[in-house]
């Protein structure tokens, strides 16, 4: 049994709530609550979808940041990247266009090939690539060590005053080509000057090991020169005594 609210007779009719009006108010409140729930649910679902999208985006960026596999051939000593000064990089880019190369790597290879003489003069040994990139035949280890030994010998002889400079005078003012007598020409005769004795060459039997025959050959050549001048001295003395 539903109890109806008592109506106040003193109040006007429009202020006294009827049952129909109460039912309408109840339905309207229920609709508002349902509408609020729907709006809240949609917002919550939208937020969840946004969070899922953010997670997917983060995973995609992490996969994108992974280093790509190196598709080039593996070469000993090869780094993934070479940092160049800005001017050098710009010049290499310009040379690549001027020379018609396909990449900057070809230009660098071309520069190394043409700079090989300067590299040899600066480092003696030069560069040693893993594969042949120089069109000319590379120098052997024997020739490289011969070159270094020759330079060391020349430096020592200059310090001792036994090597003539370009003007024809020796270092330190000591000239073996003048003032000795016996018709002795000094340094060039014993193979230390500009005219080397034929056949007297420095050879290497192994890398970094001198051939003992070289010293024997040098001793024989020096003995032959000294014996030749001694024989001429004896002939000159005999002629002076005979006269």
Curated annotation (Swiss-Prot):
Subunit annotation: Interacts with SPL.
Segments forming domain TCP: 68-122
One Gene Ontology term from the biological process aspect of the record: regulation of DNA-templated transcription
Keywords recorded for this protein, A-Z: Coiled coil, DNA-binding, Nucleus, Transcription, Transcription regulation
Pfam families with a match to the protein in the record: TCP (PF03634)
Chain intervals for the UniProt region annotation (Disordered): 1-55
Biased segments, Polar residues type: 8-21
Localization: Nucleus
Underlying gene: TCP6
Composition bias, Basic and acidic residues: 22-35
Protein's organism: Arabidopsis thaliana
Record protein name field: Transcription factor TCP6
A GO CC annotation given for this chain: nucleus
Annotated disulfide bonds: none
Major subcellular location class: nucleus
GO molecular function: DNA binding; DNA-binding transcription factor activity
Coiled coil: 42-66
